[in-house]
Regions:
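A subset of signal/propeptide-processing and intrinsically disordered low-complexity segments
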Residues: 2, 17, 42, 64-66
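Short aromatic-glycine-(Arg/Gly/Cys) micro-motifs in beta-strand/loop hairpins
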Residues: 1-10, 26-51
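Repeat-associated, polar segments at repeat-unit boundaries in modular proteins
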Residues: 53-55, 62
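Short intrinsically disordered terminal tails
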Residues: 1-4, 61, 68-77
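Intrinsically disordered, low-complexity coil/linker segments enriched for acidic/polar
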Residues: 16, 58-60
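A short, exposed loop/beta-hairpin motif centered on an aromatic-Gly-Thr core
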Residues: 8-18
Length: 77
């Protein structure tokens, strides 16, 4: 798995889907999000209660969004 991708559940990042799923199941069925980088650029959302996987955006869209945000911050400084 690419190190830029992390699973996110309720403020916590996990390197593996299994860890994230276990945490989500113990956290009242919260969604597991596949994110790009340290930011909440969600690519996929997994709903443990319904076991449904939903695409939020593509990897390229997430990368472009992060790049735009980075460029905005550089311009402001």
């Amino acid at each position: 798995m690419n190190e830029n991708f992390m699973y996110y559940v309720n403020g916590h990042y996990f390197k593996t889907l299994n860890e994230a799923q276990n945490y989500a199941r113990g956290d009242h069925g919260r969604d597991v999000l596949l994110t790009y980088g340290d930011y909440d650029e969600t690519i996929l959302s997994y709903h443990p209660m319904s076991e449904r996987l939903e695409r939020i955006q593509t990897v390229n869209e997430a990368k472009e969004k992060l790049l735009r945000e980075y460029e905005k911050k550089q311009f402001i400084k």
